[in-house]
Design a protein with these regions (language model features):
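Helix-loop boundary and gating motifs at the non-cytosolic
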Residues: 2-51
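Intracellular juxtamembrane helix-capping segments at the cytosolic ends
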Residues: 31, 113-127
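Central cavity-lining transmembrane alpha-helices of secondary-active solute carriers
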Residues: 44-65
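Glycine-rich segments within core transmembrane alpha-helices of 12-TM secondary carriers
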Residues: 51, 133-158
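Transmembrane alpha-helix termini and helix-breaking/packing motifs in multi-pass membrane transporters
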Residues: 59-63, 90, 147-168
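Cytoplasmic membrane-interface "Motif A"-like loop-to-helix N-cap segments
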Residues: 63-80
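C-terminal ends and interior cores of transmembrane alpha-helices
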Residues: 75-96
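Symmetry-related core transmembrane helices of the 12-TM Major Facilitator Superfamily/SLC fold
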Residues: 77-83, 164-183
Length: 190
């Protein structure tokens, strides 16, 4: 892999990791608090953590993904579902549609976890042994950056522009973060 491709590949993976983490951090911060205010049990709030169960469907993703294109399809389809659900939630009223919102967020987390499975697998396959630590750094930076933005910056924006103004922007960001992968022809299984 030449240096330019490697740099672009690293940036692509950074975008994928930050795109999955920003909305998840926002929802994981806001929704549990609101659920407690609505007297949901802790076990019901625990349903917002489908990521811990992703080992149940990760073999299916791996079994149906052999080529770089297969993994990209998993990433695109799951991220587009993720963005679509975030966008749909933006048009629901938090007080009257609360149960629908929680259900859609849980489904969106499953889509995000599926994207993570495919992204992790592609990162492992696309980078040589000596570059795997760089790819892991992109994962860490994207995850930490996404947590700071989703759990911090978005909370401030949420207070300023509200649920209906914020979530369409978040959905568009998730889609925009797919663009580097869409245009990246340099990712190849090593």
């Amino acid at each position: 892999m030449i240096q330019k491709d490697k740099t672009y590949n690293l940036a692509t993976f950074f975008c994928l990791y930050i795109a999955q983490t920003i909305p998840m951090s926002f929802f994981s911060t806001v929704i549990p608090v609101m659920m407690r205010q609505e007297n949901f049990s802790l076990s019901a709030i625990g349903l917002l953590q489908p990521w811990i169960l992703k080992f149940l469907w990760s073999p299916m993703v791996d079994r149906h993904a052999v080529t770089t294109g297969d993994y990209k399809r998993w990433i695109f389809s799951s991220e587009l579902i993720y963005a679509g659900l975030i966008f749909a939630v933006a048009f629901l009223d938090f007080h009257t549609d609360f149960y629908t919102i929680v259900a859609l967020i849980i489904i969106s987390f499953v889509a995000s976890a599926t994207q993570d499975i495919a992204t992790d697998a592609l990162a492992v396959l696309a980078f040589s042994r000596k570059d795997k630590s760089l790819a892991n750094s992109m994962q860490s930076m994207g995850s930490f950056g996404g947590s700071m933005i989703g759990g911090g910056v978005l909370l401030l924006l949420f207070k300023q522009i509200g649920w209906n103004g914020l979530l369409p922007c978040v959905a568009l960001f998730v889609i925009a973060a797919l663009l580097p992968l869409f245009f990246n022809k340099g990712i190849r299984i090593q």
